[in-house]
Amino acid sequence: MKVLEGIVTAPNAKIAVVIARFNSFINESLLEGALDALKRIGQVKDENITLVRVPGAYELPLIARRLADSKKYDAIVALGTVIRGGTAHFEYVAGEASSGLGQVAMQAEIPVAFGVLTTENIEQAIERAGTKAGNKGAEAALVALEMVNLLAQIDKA
């Protein structure tokens, strides 16, 4: 039986990180985690990482699609935070960001790691950005690298 599993080291991978500015005080922690994971664990060279800032989580899919279509990147890491408020806005933004990023991955056939926090309150967001619940930015970066390696293995198999 042949078993394919990805690894998280990818020193030559070209990675785009797309980050929303809205809720930047949380997103910057996600970014720190993602960059640390890419460089320290994934051994990705600094010159192989491109950072793109967008206004909010709703804008992530369009920019991710443009980056994917450029064929310059092996994977995209999308980072942002959507916190539930008193209106339906949360559902629209969170749903469109999630659905849109998934569509980019499927249509462009490139890993798009979902590092967008969708939380009930600010406390949950802070916990997931590097305190009690780990750093979801770092986790998304490692998912991207593992998927790059797994797709390469499938192509060789």
Swiss-Prot record:
Name listed for the protein in its UniProt record: 6,7-dimethyl-8-ribityllumazine synthase
GO molecular function: 6,7-dimethyl-8-ribityllumazine synthase activity
Subunit-structure text: Forms an icosahedral capsid composed of 60 subunits, arranged as a dodecamer of pentamers.
Organism: Histophilus somni (strain 2336)
UniProt GO BP: riboflavin biosynthetic process
Lineage of the organism: Bacteria, Pseudomonadati, Pseudomonadota, Gammaproteobacteria, Pasteurellales
Binding site for 5-amino-6-(D-ribitylamino)uracil: 22, 57-59, 81-83, 114
Gene: ribH
Family: Belongs to the DMRL synthase family.
SUPFAM superfamilies for this protein: Lumazine synthase
Function: Catalyzes the formation of 6,7-dimethyl-8-ribityllumazine by condensation of 5-amino-6-(D-ribitylamino)uracil with 3,4-dihydroxy-2-butanone 4-phosphate. This is the penultimate step in the biosynthesis of riboflavin.
